[in-house]
Amino acid sequence: MFKFNDEKGQLKCSFCGKTQDQVRKLVAGPGVYICDECIELCTEIVEEELGTEEEVEFQEVPKPHEIREILDDYVIGQDLAKKSLSVAVYNHYKRINSMSKSEEVELSKSNICMIGPTGSGKTLLAQTLARILNVPFAIADATSLTEAGYVGEDVENILLKLIQAADYDVEKAEKGIIYIDEIDKVARKSENPSITRDVSGEGVQQALLKILEGTTASVPPQGGRKHPHQEFIQIDTTNILFICGGAFDGIEQIIKRRLGKKVIGFGSEVKQDELKPGEYLSKVLPEDLLRFGLIPEFIGRLPVISSLQPLDEEALIEILTKPKNALVKQYKKLLELDDVNLEFTDEALREIARKAIERKTGARGLRSIIEGLTLDVMFDLPARDDVETCIIHDKCVTEGEPPILKMKDGSEVAMTKPEPKESA
């Protein structure tokens, strides 16, 4: 039987027989020891056998047209954004595949910056992309990040979320997608560099630079702050696709000032470009982001800039009815489980869209409006068995009138709210 101790009482590796003095580390198991050299050798053997299988995962990246078609199933409008995202994502994973081959041309990484008002579909686009590609996906909020050494989250915690989404499979996480929301909130507070330290603005941008470009980062497995006596997870960010999104409130004014008044020809009149509100975002350039407060190095690591337009009335109506996860379909299904049909008139849908535009909440505000309209319906109808159909019309939205109920006996009545009981 193999001895785990030599004559001097030193521990030995159960595989190669080297003592603890001859190796860097011995890992103990129940009645067995293995050294770091044997671990490395075993890893190489396993990688050689399984490596070819792992490479197949990304051999068939969907073509840009295919990515765009799937995005159309979930996201309404934003055609230009979907087109640029499809190309950027396709090129990113094509680049990963090409890295395994020895080629003279080195392809650089193309992270994405999405600019658009709240509720325009930035997060949904990123989530749908991850679903299409079947890769780990994590969402991080830039507002909670601070420079290392200050109260708040370190930028490495973003990577931890991705590792957790990949069930701690680091190799899988290294080909994932990270969406950093509210990136505009880490803009420099003023255009001129300040002598005071900006730990939640420019400091965060500086901390994100290396991760965005590609580095081997040390991530604390439990999150939180680093301390020298803990083990770290090493993750290479070279092949992680970063998508940064934000509303960038006020950038339209910067673009307007840059476009300014243009003179065409000699002696011609000064002419002002007339664009509709929201169209200015499509004219955004890196210099506008610089004036907004992003540092040049940070802008340089986000080469693909994609702008999303504010959603108009027609787009919001389509969002309510067309996608696979459309809100109207969801609420119809919920009442269908109680054997009641739910219907929204075309005028009601239009008024819901108008209300969302008034509130300036975009698609995100649609759910709260419908929730308010259907609260009494969802509360009362499950207890009744005489109702066949519930119709929500435009007056329900504009004047707060009750929905119309079609009864099983063929009659139609307005839904009545139960009278509150008088307190004794």
UniProtKB/Swiss-Prot annotation:
GO cellular component, one term: HslUV protease complex
Biological function: ATP-dependent specificity component of the Clp protease. It directs the protease to specific substrates. Can perform chaperone functions in the absence of ClpP.
Residue numbers binding Zn(2+): 13, 16, 35, 38
Name of the protein described by the UniProt record: ATP-dependent Clp protease ATP-binding subunit ClpX
ClpX-type ZB domain location: 1-54
Keyword Nucleotide-binding on entry: yes
PANTHER family from the UniProt entry: ATP-DEPENDENT CLP PROTEASE ATP-BINDING SUBUNIT CLPX-LIKE, MITOCHONDRIAL (PTHR48102:SF7), ATP-DEPENDENT CLP PROTEASE ATP-BINDING SUBUNIT CLPX-LIKE, MITOCHONDRIAL-RELATED (PTHR48102)
Top-rank lineage group of the source organism: Bacteria
Xref: SUPFAM superfamilies: Glucocorticoid receptor-like (DNA-binding domain), P-loop containing nucleoside triphosphate hydrolases
Binding residues annotated for ATP, in chain numbering: 117-124
Family under the similarity heading: Belongs to the ClpX chaperone family.
Pfam families membership: AAA_2 (PF07724), ClpB_D2-small (PF10431), zf-C4_ClpX (PF06689)
Subunit record text: Component of the ClpX-ClpP complex. Forms a hexameric ring that, in the presence of ATP, binds to fourteen ClpP subunits assembled into a disk-like structure with a central cavity, resembling the structure of eukaryotic proteasomes.
UniProt KW keywords: ATP-binding, Chaperone, Metal-binding, Nucleotide-binding, Zinc
Organism in which the protein naturally occurs: Halalkalibacterium halodurans (strain ATCC BAA-125 / DSM 18197 / FERM 7344 / JCM 9153 / C-125) (Bacillus halodurans)
Molecular functions (GO terms): ATP binding; ATP hydrolysis activity; ATP-dependent protein folding chaperone; protein dimerization activity; unfolded protein binding; zinc ion binding
Gene Ontology terms describing biological process: cell division; proteolysis involved in protein catabolic process
